[in-house]
Every structure is written in structure tokens, then in C-alpha cells.
Amino acid sequence: MPQITRSIELFEKAKKFIPGGVNSPVRAFKSVGGTPIYMAKGSGAYMTDVDGNTYLDYVGSWGPFILGSMHPRITAALEYTLKNIGTSFGTPIEMEIEIAELLCQIVPSLEMVRMVNSGTEATMSAVRLARGYTGRDKIIKFEGCYHGHGDSFLIKAGSGALTLGAPDSPGVTKGTAQDTLNATYNDIESVKLLVQENKGNVAAIIIEPVAGNTGVIPAQPGFLAALRQLCDEEGIVLIFDEVMCGFRVALGGAQSLYGVTPDLTTMGKIIGGGLPVGAFGGKRKLMERVAPLGDVYQAGTLSGNPLALTAGLETLKILMDENPYPELERKAVILEEGFKANLAKLGLNYVQNRVGSMSCLFFTETPVVNYTTAITADTKKHAKYFHSLLDQGIYTAPSQFEAMFISSVMTDEDLDKTIKANYNALVASQQ
């Protein structure tokens, strides 16, 4: 077990000034117990904590670090921007046009795009746009999917809300809750029923095409296409939330992987290269309703700031130049097969779900295809598993219901180390 004296000291101090001692709930280790680890530095595939312990990083800042931490090209680009351009102006800059054009080239659904400062801003804005465009109030989301902490989304939500065992939040008004309808992921009939019960009143269906905040749950064959058809028939705006899976499962996101094009797409994480960023975009006829061109208001003081755009642009250029996706897939298969072999050796039948370089090991024998099946996982066994990995220098998400991310800079030696640690952690989970 690593020495974490300084982390303990810092957490106790943090709790005096910061609610729960953290600025995002999942970081508090509530579902796994123990003290959150305070990091001091990241480099490549590794992080070092304030006590000098080093960890192989499978959280990757919750997804953005597909290229690892402190990539030399991104670091150099940021340094140049800091020294020669500036941090923010509150005016248009040329870089905004460059990243917008690049995003429209890469992502199938994008004809126009608006930069914002977070994934939450992106999803809130996309839903507002859908309501403004259709003149309707209700939206359909899916149980366990997480679309940020906007009020409309904190109803049967995933990610940190699910981690804390509270997928709903006080402070969400009854009116908001009534306008948010929840369907079952991978169940098109549940969606059709809600649409029929609310005929002519549904503005949008928003979905993670790879649900990454209830563990990892891929859309089953035909499900997204059926949603597309239903939305076309009913005049509903289809929104893909690709904040997590965008540029992760494929350069063009899950929509390019599955061949289904939404009306609007929300993005974040990877397109910020580790800095705060978000974006939403889609069909021109919808995006032309966004202010100042149209009547649907959206604004942001720091939207499109040079630092975030620099990191995002350089990340996208590296992904296009180097095409790490085949190698990421190879590494992901190595881990998946290694974990599968370990489970077999121990006579365990736990479920592994994976799409590209994001995956989740569920501590359940029930196939995980939606929220209901995901929560059959044994969180107590997962907690033991997590701490065993941590003790072995492997940092994974401190929640059963979050994804494990591979970065392009991980070596085969790193993977071998992880597979060995996985075996030991599985043993520990059963004790």
C-alpha cells in the first residue's frame, strides 16, 4: 500500500473550504471508500501524487487524454499561445474559424458549430435549440445516461450522480422533471411509447451513442438507426451527446462508427486537449437559429478562448496526422483478452463491455445493456478491486459506473503490468 500522508492532510484541509473536499463529486472516493489521491504531476501515461507515488493512468482526466498527459506538441503549442497570443480577448479570433472548419470536416453531422466552455454547456444549449426550433417543451433521455449537470438531465442520471447512489437531484423543479421523459437504453419500444403518449410535444431525443457514464454500454445493432427513423417520422430533433465518445471511439465519433447521423451533436473532453471546452453543432437549418443569427440565445465570456482552442486544434491535428485508432484498438483487445483470461482462471463470469479504447468491467454476471442491468453490479466487490489496483500503481475510476480509458502512449509493458494487477485485484475483490 502506497504512503498517502500528504493526500490525507490535503483532503482534511479541503473539506473546510470546498463542499465534500472536491470540485466534482466522483473524485471524493465516496463509492469506494478511503481518501482521494491528490496528484502533483502527469506525464505520458503516468501520474505522480503529492507523496511521490506513481500511477498508470486509466482515467485520463475522465477521457480527454487520448494522447496521454503533457503531449509535447500540445504543450509546445500552449506555450507559444501563452507567450505570443494571450489567454482571452472577448473578441472573435481566427483560431475559432480554424477549429470550426476542422470539426465540420471530421464529424458527419456538423454543418455549423458553436464553441462553449464545457460539455454541460453544450448539452444545455443543444436542448434549448431543439426546443426553440420545434416549439415543443419535452425531451426524452435515457436512464443512466449523463449529459452534464443541467437541471433537465439530473433525472435518473448516470456518472457522479449514479456513483453517489442519487441519480436524481433536489433543486430540480417539478416542471423541469415533467418535461424530461426517461426511456430505457437499447429499447426502442420504450421510446416509441413515450413519443406516442406525448404526441407532438417532444422536442428532442438526447442519447450517448456509447453510454459511458453507466460504465460502458454500446448501442445495440439497429437501435440508433431506429431512433433516427422515429425522429424523422415525428419531427423530433435527434441529439447525440458525444462529449465522451466523440473522437475516442473513432475520429468522427460514434456517429461515424455506427453510420447514423444525428441532427445535433455535443462535444467536449478530447477537443479541449485537457482544457475546459465544449461545442455543439449540426444541421445548418438548426444552427442558424442560434443568436446572433437567430433567436435562440447562447453566450459565453470565455467561449472560444485561445488557450482551449490551441489545445483542441493541436489534439485534432495529431489525431489526423498519426491516426492512433488502430493501435488503440490493438491495445484495448490485449487488455480485454487478458482480463478475460484472468476471469476464466478464477472461475468468474463478470461482464466486460468495450467500444474502442473505452471499456468497463462490471462486477455482475448479467449482460449489461442498460441502466437496470448495470446496477446489478456488486459495488462492494468493485471497491475492493479498485483499491487493490491502486495499491499496485494502477489508477482507475473510483466508481463501478465509469469508463476505463486507454491512451496512445501506453506501452505493451504497461498493458502487461495492468493484466497482472487485474488478476491480483480480482482475487482481492472476492475476499
Swiss-Prot record:
It holds the Pfam family Aminotran_3. Keywords: Chlorophyll biosynthesis, Cytoplasm, Isomerase, Porphyrin biosynthesis, Pyridoxal phosphate. It comes from Chlorobium chlorochromatii (strain CaD3). The modification N6-(pyridoxal phosphate)lysine is found at residue 269. This is Glutamate-1-semialdehyde 2,1-aminomutase. One of its GO terms (cellular component) is cytoplasm. Gene3D superfamilies: Aspartate Aminotransferase, domain 1, Type I PLP-dependent aspartate aminotransferase-like (Major domain). Its cofactor is pyridoxal 5'-phosphate. It is found in: Cytoplasm. Belongs to the class-III pyridoxal-phosphate-dependent aminotransferase family. HemL subfamily. Transmembrane segments: none annotated. Its EC number is 5.4.3.8. One of its GO terms (biological process) is chlorophyll biosynthetic process. Pathway: Porphyrin-containing compound metabolism; protoporphyrin-IX biosynthesis; 5-aminolevulinate from L-glutamyl-tRNA(Glu): step 2/2; Porphyrin-containing compound metabolism; chlorophyll biosynthesis. PANTHER family: GLUTAMATE-1-SEMIALDEHYDE 2,1-AMINOMUTASE, GLUTAMATE-1-SEMIALDEHYDE 2,1-AMINOMUTASE 1, CHLOROPLASTIC-RELATED. It catalyses: (S)-4-amino-5-oxopentanoate = 5-aminolevulinate.
